[in-house]
Amino acid sequence: YEIVQGDWSSDVCSSDLGFGIINDYSQAKIDILKPIIDKYFIRYTQKDAGFETSVNENILYCNMLESTYNIAKSLKKDKVVKGVFEAILADTAVKEMSKLHQIYSGTVKFESGKSMIIDHSKGFFIKDKFEGQKIAIFYKFKEEFNLLKEVFGDLLTDDLSVFDNSNKNIALQIVSGREGISLANAKYLVYFNIDFSAVSYWQSRDRLTTMERTTNDVYWIFSKGGIESKIYKSVSNKKDFTLSVFKKTYND
């Protein structure tokens, strides 16, 4: 093996994938690592395999409840929103970015660790827009699945085999569904929320592709006036939505 010179791992953190906690190297210094590890990879692209795909991306905007916008506004101004039993705290920029990311899609995780659905608007928007169509939904936060389940009821599953063998729709967390699976039985891929990772953006939107199906229709559901469009602008340009990007762009 080779010793990599330079502090390439200073931004390594931990990520909770639901089934366990792993080291997250997405913020490692790629410019230092890439020249070392590139020679150990074999790249075989879709073009090399004899086919190329196209992704038709559509962005739809959803009006959230007035109460949702009020919570976001108060959090940005006061850095805390207190309820009768719980509190939403944004005493650091990292927390503010995370809480706004949650709130603008209709859920929030309190300081106690408990999560709550505060707005079903996106869920009903998706249900109404794609009524009668078989869709695959990507969500970001765990509570968002509960929101979608409340809206779709028995028409929603998180089991791929059930999805493939029934008329049910499927909802998967972006980080666990972005690679290694096929959602080709869905007519459309719908994003309830968006991830901060550019890798998640590029990998997950190709889940409908097969050799026979080379054109995919993807829909992004953003809250009007929310944070999602800022995230999209960053990750679609192959840049993670980091704290520094949040600070620079969110108030533009």
Task: Name each model-derived stretch.
Residues 1-16:
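Single conserved hydrophobic/aromatic residue that forms the stacking wall/gate
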Residues 10, 35-39:
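Post-DEXD/H (motif II) to motif III coupling segment of the RecA-like Helicase ATP-binding lobe
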Residues 19-28, 58-64:
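A short helix-loop-helix "switch/interaction" segment in the helical subdomain of ASCE P-loop NTPases
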Residues 51-184, 188, 246-252:
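Conserved Helicase C-terminal RecA-like lobe
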Residues 65-68, 143-144, 177-178, 195-197, ...:
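Conserved nucleotide-binding/hydrolysis micro-motifs of P-loop NTPases
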Residues 161-171, 198-206, 229-230:
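Short, charged, surface-exposed secondary-structure boundary motifs
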Residues 175, 180-214:
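Conserved RecA-like helicase motor core of SF1/SF2 enzymes
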Residues 199-202, 209-252:
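A conserved SF2-helicase RecA2
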